[in-house]
């Protein structure tokens, strides 16, 4: 993208993605956002970055004097659901203290936004569980949490201003969400607030190093991870105060706020049990609550387990990450051996912190500070030679994918980063093989174990995410957007930037991708990641009696005897087909 490119008026034209899912019902009726932007529309958005427009809108009013109003509002979103180390919340609290006004927190449940980003019922239930805990904590500080549900999404900016008017606020603070639709929404909020004599402030919080900092000398965004990571780490170490210092926790309101004419009623509000169109059945709700306990305290405990205890085979599957029995170790904790064991799926070799990061229940800054405390160093270890450094690199990947989302927003509009691959001929998204993939009935044990793990736990080890994704795209030759959507709808840690980045990497269509001719062999991946087949036995019980290499690739006779499906595609033939179609996009 050329920064000095002539700005174009974005077209509203879109191209429908084949085999759209059924519309998601909401309180305002049916709403189906599944569209793919045209190449021209996406290019126009790339040439006029929404984040830059939002920052310009906020910066243009930075010195404006606005009357104090009756309170100060912090607008919490589903990516910053915490009280500790929350930049916008800290700023709102500081303003409230300076002006001697109460602090009010608002939260807007927007079903159409959830549908637009393919949020799943598990993610929404996790959001609600965390909101209830936040409400209790805020209540102890005499800070009301006002939760409302709003549709349609197109009128949400005006609704935000109406909520400010309702509580008598003239100033609001929120952390930036980097998706295109959300940035456009917040630009509108700024514009309406200005017309109404209010000020809406939006600040960076999600990333460790915010988008736009670790960029090339000409100001353009990196599309390759390695140079980004080197600059990211150097910047982080050179300016630790700016990027790593924790934000202050909010100060409590005076208890008299409970008798305030406008604000007192807000304490009586509740968090809904569910959101229409995103309900979980009772069994799944209980299961998710066990596997993924809510709250900041739970998130900190999950992180501490990763930093201080050894991995355990019994923790590989659907279990509470805080289960009893973890053995503490300084030298052999999961993070210390992360570099060697991170690709093994037969134990809890990774942090399991992703659901908490995706919902902002813990800050990424806190994660980095914890590694520094562990090393006892004044510098952040981001190298490849230590387990700690390798894990910090994963946090850098998270920032990298957000940077890509900001610098090349077309990737969040259904477009491949490498545009020539928009013409690849895919098989249909509703072919029987797609259902087999989703259900874990492909005849490839490692793929089936991974897909069944998603259905059971709402989570999947990153190595298996790559393996199952590449199988769908390269072996079945199914559009990567079909899988991207399925992951978002079923994973409790669904994050647009990371999910899109991962899928486009596997599909060879994205930034810093796997070359199109690099195609995982599921059998070899299985032997490397799950050598003894323990993970497969956990999720594919039909094969639990098998041992040795047979569990990775059972013969047709064995599969038939055990009631396990035969492979739905021959890997060698599928590989040749994929290479042929990627080599000449548009030809079959």
Which ranges hold each PLM region?
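Trp/Phe/Arg-rich N-terminal binding region typifying the photolyase-homology
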Residues: 2-252, 498, 572, 580-588
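Active-site-proximal binding-pocket segments
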Residues: 346-537
């Amino acid at each position: 993208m050329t920064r000095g490119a002539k700005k174009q008026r974005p077209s509203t034209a879109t191209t429908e993605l084949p085999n759209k899912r059924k519309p998601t019902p909401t309180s305002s009726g049916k709403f189906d956002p599944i569209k793919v932007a045209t190449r021209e529309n996406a290019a126009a958005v790339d040439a006029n970055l929404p984040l830059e427009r939002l920052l310009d809108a906020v910066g243009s009013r930075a010195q404006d004097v606005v009357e104090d109003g009756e309170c100060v509002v912090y607008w919490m979103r589903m990516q910053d659901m915490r009280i500790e180390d929350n930049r916008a919340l800290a700023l709102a609290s500081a303003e409230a203290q300076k002006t001697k006004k109460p602090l009010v927190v608002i939260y807007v449940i927007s079903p159409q936004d959830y549908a637009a980003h393919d949020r799943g019922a598990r993610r929404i239930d996790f959001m609600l569980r965390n909101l209830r805990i936040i409400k209790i904590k805020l209540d102890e500080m005499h800070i009301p949490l006002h939760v409302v549900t709003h549709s349609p999404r197109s009128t949400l900016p005006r609704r935000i201003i109406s909520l400010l008017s309702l509580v008598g606020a003239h100033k609001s603070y929120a952390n930036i969400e980097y998706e295109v639709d959300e940035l456009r929404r917040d630009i509108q909020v700024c514009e309406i607030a200005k017309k109404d004599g209010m000020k809406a402030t939006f600040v960076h919080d999600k990333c460790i190093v915010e988008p736009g900092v670790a960029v090339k000398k000409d100001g353009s965004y990196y599309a390759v991870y390695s140079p980004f990571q080197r600059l990211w780490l150097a910047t982080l170490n050179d300016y630790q105060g700016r990027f790593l210092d924790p934000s202050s926790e909010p100060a409590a309101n005076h208890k008299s706020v409970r008798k305030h004419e406008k604000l007192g009623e807000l304490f009586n509000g509740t968090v809904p049990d569910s959101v229409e169109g995103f309900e979980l059945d009772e069994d799944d709700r209980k299961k998710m609550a066990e596997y993924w306990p809510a709250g900041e305290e739970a998130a900190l405990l999950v992180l501490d387990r990763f930093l201080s205890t050894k991995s355990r085979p019994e923790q590989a599957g659907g279990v509470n990450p805080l289960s009893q029995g973890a053995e503490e170790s300084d030298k052999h904790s999961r993070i210390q051996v992360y570099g060697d064991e991170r690709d093994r799926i037969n134990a809890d070799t990774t942090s399991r912190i992703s659901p908490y990061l995706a919902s902002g229940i813990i800050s990424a800054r806190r994660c980095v500070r914890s590694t520094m405390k562990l090393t006892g160093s004044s510098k952040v270890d981001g190298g490849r030679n230590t387990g700690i450094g390798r894990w910090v690199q994963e946090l850098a990947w998270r920032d990298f994918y957000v940077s890509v989302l900001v610098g090349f927003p077309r990737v969040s509009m259904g477009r491949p980063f490498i545009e020539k691959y928009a013409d690849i001929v895919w098989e249909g998204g509703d072919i029987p093989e797609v259902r087999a993939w989703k259900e874990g009935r492909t005849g490839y044990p490692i793929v089936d174990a991974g897909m069944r793990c998603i259905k059971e736990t709402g989570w999947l080890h990153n190595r298996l995410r790559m393996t199952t994704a590449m199988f769908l795209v390269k072996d079945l030759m199914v559009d990567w957007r079909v899988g991207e959507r399925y992951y978002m709808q079923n994973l409790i840690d669904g994050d647009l930037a990371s999910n899109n980045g991962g899928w486009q990497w596997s599909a060879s269509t994205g930034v810093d991708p796997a070359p199109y001719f690099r195609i995982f062999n599921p059998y070899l991946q299985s032997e490397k990641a799950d050598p003894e087949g323990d993970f497969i036995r956990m999720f594919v019980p039909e094969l639990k009696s098998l041992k040795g290499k047979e569990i990775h690739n059972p013969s047709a006779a064995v599969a038939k005897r055990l009631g396990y499906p035969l492979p739905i595609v021959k890997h060698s033939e599928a590989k040749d087909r994929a290479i042929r179609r990627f080599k000449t996009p548009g030809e079959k």
